[in-house]
Structures are given as structure tokens and as C-alpha cells.
């Protein structure tokens, strides 16, 4: 790389995957109207959203000063440019963007801006969250919240889970959510109750 990108370990892996797909499977991807680019550790709280013409669908949240890089639905006509992130990193175009804080999300957004794709981004309500097994290797967040009702599975980013379940409850009746996703609903109640109790505890004891 011509400059220090600030992208180490898991950040570099994200981009290598995209470059590998671009160089080896792009013609296969062109057989599909939409391509879902996602991580293996996503737990969905409902059916996957359908793609939309002329829109790159990215869930809300987890932007870290850029844009969330964990999931996207891309129309076929955008997929080649979308995957060219390593070409962007190796180009002089990187000098056009601030480098005081670089991570996966900021570099991802810079690349989409450079490739002319940022104008097509549409943020959608989150309907999935990141999960992990207890002993999964991680470079960043260590999972602390157990997902009760699921064998040895943990919630990695609590905000993702809470947002996903909040959206599900907002868009469906309480009866439907309880009947279809009872375990997730109980976990949601448990997590938001813990947060509220923690907030009151800090206020009462001035922690």
C-alpha cells in the first residue's frame, strides 16, 4: 500500500475478500439482479429485505464515522465498482480524503464516494445483529451477553440486537413477534431491563 491506511487484521480481511471476489467471481455475480454482501456472523430477526433498483441498501447504525460495512444489498450494475476497494486504497485518490482517523468504515465510505456510489446509498432499518460463539476469536469486541434459548450463542454488539428487535416490534404486532420469535423477544426484554436498571443504579449511587 502506498500509505498507512490504519487498517489492520480484520479491516484488511474485509477488503481482501472483496478483491478476491472481484478478480475471481465477478462474472458469476453478474448473473444476479442483486448481490447481498454480508458477514457470516449475522443473525436475522426476520425475512431479508428485497433489493431496490438504483439503491445500495445498508442497515442503519454501526457507522464509526464512516458507513456500516457489515451488510449491503447491491444492484448488479454497481457491483464491479462496489468491490474495487483495494484499487481505491492503492490509488492516489486516497489523498483527497481526511486521514486523521481511518478504519474499515471510513475507508469504505471514502471508496464509495470516490467511485460515485455514495449517492445511491439508502439506509434501511436494521433487522439483523452480529452473533458469536463463546470462544470465537475476535480482534475487537468480546461478546458478553448470552443469547438465551440458543446453544452457546452470544450477542456481540448489544445496540444492533436492540435496534433489530425494536424495528421488528414496530413493524409487526406483539402477538406475531412473540409467536414467531419468542426466544428473541425474551432476550430483548432481558437486555433492555438490564440497561434500565444499570442506568438507575448509576444515578442512585452517583457512579
Predicted regions and their residues:
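ER/Golgi luminal nucleotide-sugar-dependent glycosyltransferases, focusing on the catalytic module
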Residues: 1-207
